[in-house]
């Protein structure tokens, strides 16, 4: 079974689906991650691998830390900040 990927927002889901059309994501909708989202992540982790894939900035790090504290057992995937800036000078991956 494929993992569930935790991302920050819709744009992240859209970008991942350009590469992996069937990928399942949980969107945190920013760094103010709510209890409903935590519950979704906890439920997903009961039956699937969960990978947190957030931006390498302060909000992304904050989200990773909150999830790690509240949902032990998730895995993390992220790019170092220096490698995250696109070549065409946009800030987002």
Identify the role of each PLM range.
Residues 18-19, 23-24, 31-93:
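TOPRIM fold recognition
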């Amino acid at each position: 079974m494929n993992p569930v990927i935790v991302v920050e927002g819709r744009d992240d889901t859209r970008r991942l689906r350009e590469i992996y059309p069937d990928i399942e994501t949980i969107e945190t909708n920013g760094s103010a991650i709510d209890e409903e989202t935590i519950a979704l992540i906890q439920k997903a982790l009961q039956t699937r691998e969960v990978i947190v894939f957030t931006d390498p900035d302060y909000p992304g790090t904050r989200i990773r830390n909150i999830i790690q504290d509240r949902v032990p057992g998730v895995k993390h995937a992220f790019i170092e900040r220096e490698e995250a800036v696109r070549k065409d000078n946009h800030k987002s991956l």
